[in-house]
């Protein structure tokens, strides 16, 4: 709705009249009417505020879970069955053993003197080695004593070995053999190893140096 404000202008000179109270009230009414109309147009443009929603509060109560049901009772043990009765069986009777047959009698003829075989006589002991006449130079530095075997020394083994040593014309050892053992292999071996390195004075035959043999005792003692 549109209102036109019409102000009548009067010529001052024509009427030379001032504003009356009625005119002032009319003008004020018209202005108020226009303001009211303007306010009516502005009010629908502002949307009313929606009322604030109230916060919803949910109450939660915690309840303990029910306990699990107890396990079922174990089944009753099976009843022990009595063992079956044992039958007593009579042992079988042994069958009779037939008697052994009688051995036949054999006549053994008596041996005659000519049928008796005499065992052969044992061989004669070997003769002692001959020509054991080479002299031994006791003071010679080339006759070093044998080394005591460590195993025999630790075990406290003692003994005597008698060696037969073959010597050539120059006094060198050509062969060593054991005439009497000490009953210990380590002692016998140590004596033979030492004798192979010895040096002797050769024997003399008709004023000439000749080969020969010498008997040397070697004693192993823990002194």
UniProtKB/Swiss-Prot annotation:
An annotated GO cellular component: plasma membrane protein complex
Gene Ontology MF: a single term: energy transducer activity
Pfam annotation, one family: TonB_C
Bilayer topology term: Single-pass membrane protein
UniProt-listed GO biological process terms: protein transport; transmembrane transport
Gene3D superfamilies, A to Z: 3.30.1150.10
Domain TonB C-terminal: 133-223
Protein name: Protein TonB
Gene source species: Xanthomonas campestris pv. campestris (strain ATCC 33913 / DSM 3586 / NCPPB 528 / LMG 568 / P 25)
């Amino acid at each position: 709705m549109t209102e036109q404000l019409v102000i009548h202008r009067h010529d001052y000179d024509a009427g030379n009249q001032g504003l009356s109270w009625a005119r002032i009230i009319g003008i004020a009414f018209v202005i108020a009417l226009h303001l009211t109309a303007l306010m009516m147009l502005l009010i629908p443009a502002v949307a009313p505020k929606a009322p604030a929603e109230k916060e919803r509060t949910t109450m939660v109560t915690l309840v303990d879970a029910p306990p699990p049901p107890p396990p079922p009772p174990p089944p009753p043990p099976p009843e022990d069955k009595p063992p079956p009765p044992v039958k007593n069986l009579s042992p079988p009777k042994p069958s009779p053993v037939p008697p052994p047959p009688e051995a036949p009698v054999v006549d053994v003829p008596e041996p005659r003197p000519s049928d008796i075989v005499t065992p052969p006589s044992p061989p004669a002991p070997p003769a002692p080695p001959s020509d054991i006449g080479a002299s031994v130079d006791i003071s010679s530095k080339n006759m070093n004593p044998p080394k005591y075997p460590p195993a025999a020394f630790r075990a406290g083994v003692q003994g005597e070995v008698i060696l037969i040593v073959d010597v050539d014309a120059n006094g060198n050892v050509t062969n060593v053999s054991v005439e009497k053992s000490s009953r210990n292999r380590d002692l016998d071996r140590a004596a033979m190893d030492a004798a192979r390195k010895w040096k002797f004075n050769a024997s003399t035959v008709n004023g000439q140096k000749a080969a020969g043999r010498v008997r040397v005792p070697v004693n192993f003692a823990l002194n």
